[in-house]
Amino acid sequence: MPRKLPFLVSHLIKNVPYVCRPSVANGVFPALGIHLNQVKFELIDGTEKEATFMSVNIAPQSSGKSAVNKPVEYILADIVEHDKVNREREQEWKDSMNKKGANKEKPKRPDDLCVQVLVSDMTNAAFVQRMNDAKGKYLYTNLEEIELLRQLHTNGTKDVGKIICLCFDNGMYGQERVGTQSVTARVALRWNWNASTTILKGQKFFRGSLVDGTLSRLNISTIIPDKTKPFVYGKYDEQFAADLKPYIDRLNEARGTVVCREALRMAKRMLDKCQREGDLTGDDVYQDLSYRAVTIAYLKAMVLYIAHGMQWSKEIEKFAEWSLNYDLWCKCHYFGDDMTDEKQKERVVHKRGRQNMLEMLPERFTEDQVVEVRRRLGLDDDAKNMLRVWVYRKYIQKDNDSGIYRKYLNKKC
């Protein structure tokens, strides 16, 4: 991490163990982001984006993944207090509903019950109801375990990748029901969240959805245990909350489209650097991940820009650059090999059906040459059965003495 950090980041990580600070420095942004309401940022491609953050901490068991919880608790304190009032009002409405007889007119549910901080155990209907109640505000959940994402449904299926894509793009989400007491709503998905997982479970969870844009929309962090450093937490008290309050207040007060030319120039430099490194190394995975990683780092810089009173600083810039490199390192380190494998399979599927293996072979060829062609297409090495079929169908003939195969003229398989 940079030695000198923006005050807000430095303040939020100062009480967590040293080895946890990089992950916490990234993990606080989902909670910071939900304080922004009706705020958009101009991107380098001319579009606008809201402060959407989905942070996943992938680290060994008992490594301190919960270190982010206390800073997040203080960040969300004002919103949780507001939620408490609306939760009580909602419970009063439920109680009055239960007191009414079956033939009595039921009281209408209040339409201003905005609750932004949700528990991790929720039904899809409850989630849709909370989004509808929020009226454009962001929701937040600390999912603890990444598997809890499967509670939610898109198109009747537990499609985690689709939910992540909708979150990042603020896509439309909801459900359609016919019952009078059922939740029917369809709204733009504004939901920031934190989740954690162990390394093997995380790799298994995302396997099969690494090249469809799912991983690139996440912000990944990790914890590398260091047994030589003591695992000690600092003190969270009223002074900690008081020092944090001005920064939270500025986020709450912000409105409209926020533009910072220094931040845009930084984002352009970061993207150019990533593309240059990808070109020089020939690393397709790095290039695929870099564009959205730059966007995520830029959004962090803009949140800090607002929180620090619309003041740009070298500390914000250096932190954003470090955050980008850290995010890309974590993604490539934990998922790079699997992404490469999935990309290769995708290429094979794309080509399959359009490439005639017989046309890829010379007029005279051996079984070894057929095996090589099959490998290039991602097939297994067993060519014997295919060659027998080709001989039977008179696409080729075999010289039993030499073992050489020869194509029949004007024949194609």
PLM regions and their residue ranges:
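Phosphate-handling catalytic cores of nucleic-acid transaction enzymes
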Residues: 1-413
